[in-house]
């Protein structure tokens, strides 16, 4: 019986021949019947793929056989079996698109000049010790935060990751430069870059949630500082860490509580829109 699984991971490390890595990763993933998206650049690899658990395990073992990827933090979750339409493996200037590849510096230990990594329990200790001096800073697209975010987090007004550089340069967050800023995102990759961009712009004390929201949810579920659902970039659209998750999202049609996204352009040109099950049924009827 097939057991569908999804794995998410990234590694920042210098890659002399990204195209060779792309070909190897495509061959490895295809041979194991996986679908999903893998991005490769001179800075490393960023992958989200899914398939049957036995195939995924073989892929993970093969990926870790390459020395620079041997310590990759693999995040596992349950899939649906048809979570991605196809397998896509591409070389790009960046493995997460901030539009600032020239600013990123990477060595064998990862991103140079990034924020200090904090495990979930270390984040709690920081908040307990520093209180209001600690600010959570969302490193995701704005729509993702509509259904879930850390309590009292700063959520930048961005619709794509490319807009973060302009946001940081706008000055609207300069009042946070003397705060303890904890950046967070889904699995950690965006905050690797975001935290380095913030530090280079004068933010004095920048941290990043190690392993992202995924690892935090595994550790604390809905009993900690996280509230709501987590948006994910596959057919599932969102996941919860427990049956106690709050519903923060609001239906774009009736205003009722929902965490359901649909691909449906609204009057602001957005394709992903929050629509509750009742409104979906009424529209279909």
From Swiss-Prot:
Xref: CDD domains: RHOD_YceA
Assigned EC number: 1.14.-.-
Any one Gene Ontology BP term: tRNA modification
Protein keywords: Oxidoreductase, tRNA processing
Transmembrane residue ranges: none
InterPro entries per the UniProt record, alphabetical: Rhodanese-like_dom, Rhodanese-like_dom_sf, Rhodanese_C, TrhO, TRHO_N
Pfam family, one: Rhodanese_C
Active site as annotated: 185
Top-level taxon in the UniProt lineage: Bacteria
A single GO molecular function term of this UniProt record: oxidoreductase activity, acting on paired donors, with incorporation or reduction of molecular oxygen
Domain Rhodanese: 130-225
Statement: the UniProt record of this protein carries the keyword DNA-binding: no
Reactions that this protein is recorded to catalyse: uridine(34) in tRNA + AH2 + O2 = 5-hydroxyuridine(34) in tRNA + A + H2O
Entry similarity comment: Belongs to the TrhO family.
NCBIfam families in alphabetical order: PRK00142.1-2
HAMAP family per record: TrhO
Biological role: Catalyzes oxygen-dependent 5-hydroxyuridine (ho5U) modification at position 34 in tRNAs.
Protein name: tRNA uridine(34) hydroxylase
UniProt organism field: Rhodococcus jostii (strain RHA1)
Lineage of the species this protein comes from: Bacteria, Bacillati, Actinomycetota, Actinomycetes, Mycobacteriales
Gene of this entry: trhO
């Amino acid at each position: 019986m097939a057991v569908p699984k999804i794995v998410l991971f990234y590694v920042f490390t210098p890659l002399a021949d990204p195209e060779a890595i792309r070909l190897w990763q495509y061959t490895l993933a295809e041979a194991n019947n996986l679908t999903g998206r893998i991005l490769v650049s001179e800075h490393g690899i960023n992958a989200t793929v899914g398939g049957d658990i036995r195939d995924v395990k073989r892929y993970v073992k093969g990926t870790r056989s390459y020395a620079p990827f041997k310590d990759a933090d693999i995040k596992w979750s349950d899939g649906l079996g048809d979570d991605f339409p196809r397998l896509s493996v591409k070389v790009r200037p960046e493995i997460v698109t901030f539009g600032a590849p020239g600013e990123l510096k990477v060595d064998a230990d990862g991103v140079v000049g990034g924020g200090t990594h904090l495990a979930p329990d270390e984040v709690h200790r920081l908040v307990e010790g520093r209180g209001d001096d600690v600010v959570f800073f969302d490193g995701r697209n704005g729509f993702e935060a509509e259904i879930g975010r850390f309590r009292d987090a700063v959520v930048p007004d961005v619709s794509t990751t490319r807009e973060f550089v302009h946001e940081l340069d706008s000055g609207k967050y300069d009042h946070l430069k003397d705060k303890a800023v904890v950046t967070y995102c889904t699995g950690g990759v965006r905050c690797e870059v975001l935290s380095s961009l913030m530090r280079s712009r004068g933010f004095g004390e920048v941290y990043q949630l190690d392993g992202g929201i995924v690892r935090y949810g595994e550790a604390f579920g809905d009993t900690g500082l996280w509230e709501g659902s987590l948006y994910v970039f596959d057919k599932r659209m969102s996941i919860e860490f427990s049956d106690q998750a709050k519903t923060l999202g609001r239906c774009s049609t009736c205003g009722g509580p929902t965490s359901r996204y649909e691909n449906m352009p609204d009057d602001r040109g957005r394709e992903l829109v929050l629509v509750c099950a009742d409104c979906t049924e009424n529209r279909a009827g």
